[in-house]
Every structure is written in structure tokens, then in C-alpha cells.
Amino acid sequence: MKIILLGAPGAGKGTQAQFIMNKFGIPQISTGDMFRAAIKAGTELGKQAKALMDEGKLVPDELTVALVKDRIAQADCANGFLLDGFPRTIPQADALKDSGVKIDFVLEFDVPDEVIVERMSGRRVHQTSGRSYHIVYNPPKVEGKDDVTGEDLIIRADDKPETVLDRLAVYHKQTSPLIDYYQAEAKAGNTQYFRLDGTQKVEEVSQELDKILG
């Protein structure tokens, strides 16, 4: 089962990715997590990515495509995977298709911009695992602490309101065209496309996903 998640930053993709991973036992491939790991390790790619991400800009296609292709070739992706944050542009989608990867489901999470700004300002992240929480919508069991490890949660620099607005502008310009792209792919019989109302409660979105993928 090979799945692509579409939706603006803060649309709830990360939370639902956890549900899909637990339910179907496939790994999540998040380019954001990959780049954050590279940043933490202080690699050259990580330094380049950090400068761009801090400004709310996207990392160039050639860096991202190479990273993802290496990742989906690994053994744990044999039964499928979940792509979150890739592809972000039409050239990336074409590169994925050209590499012979067949996508089974494309899931779009639809949320208005103003809701996303409110959501992301309350987001808290466990840096090591990438687990994501929200102080209102999906709080940790203990305030400020990761449910699994008990370690501190952080506020990412790119969750600040001014950076969120910049990221949304980039999303609408570069990534929104993928909605039309994958709807056309679905009409051609190359994948299945579903749009979900991401303003629903987390549990309601999960139930809808269960019906679609089950």
C-alpha cells in the first residue's frame, strides 16, 4: 500500500500518518523529518536545508528527489510506505512516476488557512521521533512531555505565525497544482484520490481513513 498525503502544513497529515502507520504497519517517509535529521547531524545538506526552512522556503527538487528515492528502496518499504511532504511540485510528481513507483492512494486534507495558523501556533513536537501534538486538539498526556519517552516537547521555528503564513503562500503556489495532477491521475485509473475535511476531530478523520483504506 503506497500512499501520498496532500495538504498544507498544519492540515493534520502528521497525526493521521501515525494512525495509518499503526493500522497498516508501513513506514512514514517525511521529507521534513529527513531534513531535520540532517540538520541535527550538521551535514552540508542539513545546513542548506535549515537556511531555507527557517525562511519558510522549500528545498530544491533535486535534493529532495534523491533523498526519497534512496529511502523507498530500503527493505522496510517492501510492503508499502506513506509519503508526507513529497511530492511538493509537479516536477517531483513526474520524477516519482518516472522512477516506476505506483501510488495506490492519494489523500488530500482540506483545511482553511486561518485554521492552520491557529493550529500550528499550538503545535508541539518531540524532536527525536517527530511525534506531533497540539495543546488544544491533540494534547500529550503530560503537558510539554512526549507520551512515549517523557522527554520535552519543542516549538519548531517554522511553526511561528509569520513563518506559517509564508509557508502557506509557498504551498498554494507550488503544491496546490498537485491536487489537479493527482485527480487527473485518478481519472486515468493510475491511483485513487480522496479529499478529507481536515477540520473534523482527529478521531473522525481517522474513521474516514479506515473506511477508505480498510
UniProtKB/Swiss-Prot annotation:
User: Would the keyword Cytoplasm be found if you checked this record's keyword annotation?
Assistant: yes
Q: Which Pfam families match?
A: ADK, ADK_lid
The family database entries (InterPro entries) matched by this protein are listed as: Adenyl_kin_sub, Adenylat/UMP-CMP_kin, Adenylat_kinase_CS, Adenylate_kinase_lid-dom, P-loop_NTPase
Assigned EC number: 2.7.4.3
Q: Where is this region: LID?
A: 122-159
Q: In which pathway does it act?
A: Purine metabolism; AMP biosynthesis via salvage pathway; AMP from ADP: step 1/1
Gene3D superfamilies the record matches:
P-loop containing nucleotide triphosphate hydrolases
State its location(s).
Answer: Cytoplasm
One GO cellular component, as annotated? cytoplasm
Gene Ontology molecular function terms on file: adenylate kinase activity; ATP binding
Detail the disulphide connectivity of this chain as listed in its UniProt entry: none
Residue ranges spanning the membrane: these are: none
Q: What's the domain remark here?
A: Consists of three domains, a large central CORE domain and two small peripheral domains, NMPbind and LID, which undergo movements during catalysis. The LID domain closes over the site of phosphoryl transfer upon ATP binding. Assembling and dissambling the active center during each catalytic cycle provides an effective means to prevent ATP hydrolysis.
Protein name, per record: Adenylate kinase
Which species does this protein come from?
Answer: Haemophilus influenzae (strain PittEE)
